[in-house]
Amino acid sequence: MLELNLQLFAHKKGGGSTSNGRDSQAKRLGAKASDGELVSGGSILFRQRGTHIHPGTNVGRGGDDTLFAKIEGTVKFEMKRGKKHVSVYPVVAK
């Protein structure tokens, strides 16, 4: 008796999984208050990773390098010693 052993192979590659197709959420970094804007104490002025902009007068720096206003006043972006700083100056009553 003659026995025939037939095997059929795929003529196209299987559609396997891919390592692409995902992305991280945007972190919403950048300026949150503009130059000349009136802000209250505790307001976030600039969200950043590292010290892209340095804290100036009446501005604090959080643990994630976020810059925030320590007092109520007007925001001023300025250059000091070749570096960008953001300061908050109190409003002068007239």
Curated annotation (Swiss-Prot):
Biological processes per GO annotation: translation
Entry keyword set: Ribonucleoprotein, Ribosomal protein
GO molecular function: structural constituent of ribosome
GO CC, alphabetical: cytosolic large ribosomal subunit
Coiled coil: none
Domain of life: Bacteria
Keyword Ribonucleoprotein assigned: yes
Residues excised as propeptide: 1-9
Post-translation changes: The N-terminus is cleaved by ribosomal processing cysteine protease Prp.
UniProt keyword annotation of Ribosomal protein present: yes
Region (Disordered): 12-33
InterPro entries: Ribosomal_bL27, Ribosomal_bL27_CS
HAMAP family: Ribosomal_bL27
PANTHER family: LARGE RIBOSOMAL SUBUNIT PROTEIN BL27M (PTHR15893:SF0), RIBOSOMAL PROTEIN L27 (PTHR15893)
Similarity-based family: Belongs to the bacterial ribosomal protein bL27 family.
Record-given protein name: Large ribosomal subunit protein bL27
Taxonomic lineage: Bacteria, Bacillati, Bacillota, Bacilli, Lactobacillales
Gene it is expressed from: rpmA
